[in-house]
Curated annotation (Swiss-Prot):
Keywords: Carbohydrate metabolism, Isomerase. PANTHER family: N-ACETYLMANNOSAMINE-6-PHOSPHATE 2-EPIMERASE-RELATED. It comes from Listeria welshimeri serovar 6b (strain ATCC 35897 / DSM 20650 / CCUG 15529 / CIP 8149 / NCTC 11857 / SLCC 5334 / V8). Pathway: Amino-sugar metabolism; N-acetylneuraminate degradation; D-fructose 6-phosphate from N-acetylneuraminate: step 3/5. One of its GO terms (molecular function) is N-acylglucosamine-6-phosphate 2-epimerase activity. This is Putative N-acetylmannosamine-6-phosphate 2-epimerase. GO terms for biological process: carbohydrate metabolic process; N-acetylmannosamine catabolic process; N-acetylneuraminate catabolic process. It is an enzyme of class 5 (isomerase). It catalyses: an N-acyl-D-glucosamine 6-phosphate = an N-acyl-D-mannosamine 6-phosphate. The keyword Amino-acid biosynthesis does not apply.
Amino acid sequence: MNNSVKEKIKGGLVVSCQALSNEPLHSSFIMSKMALAAVQSGAVGIRANTTKDIKAIEEQVDVPIIGIFKNEYEGSEVFITPTYKEVKEICESGAQIVAMDATTRLRPHGEKLDEIIKTVRKEFPNILLMADTSSLEDVKYADALGFDFIGTTLYGYTEATTGKNISDNQFAYLKEVLKSTTTPIIAEGKIDTPEKAREVLALGCYSVVVGGAITRPQEITKRFINEMKKDHLGKS
């Protein structure tokens, strides 16, 4: 089962289908159709947020799902499947892979990531685990904990990495990540062009996750508008 799931996403595109509660596309039905469109176009997997969305997507597609549960807690910056409560819910949702924040930041309620991993391995032995990391330190931490996949998901999205992009300096950071571990690396985070997706696979990543550049029309529209405005700067 686990090897089958791994093989299905190897070398392919996983499309992240998510919409925040304040966005027009926030709907499990809409996300399920977004996932269907992605799979019909060749996506080998889907990344989805919340049990409700995951179950709706499962009814539409038959590909591996990377499940997460975004939840904010006071006193902690960790919000991607932050506590065992969310981890357990996603493990029971039907998702084959559960992704969670694997940074060294303080987790809600003082929970420890190593303890969460031990519990999951015991209670849900068939679930694959993906570490969402932001730094080489995180990658080494996740590697030591035995994650099945390590993602670059949070590089550029934490206080310490604000403004950084995975493609900076010819993907220098990603190259260091790939050198630091033999655990399969899933490139994710600011992979916003087909060229970047192709390059990260060429460098040795196991697979690639793309979200906003495919499934977030507001972000896509803003990119067009911002680029179009450049030609009009200084003109009256």
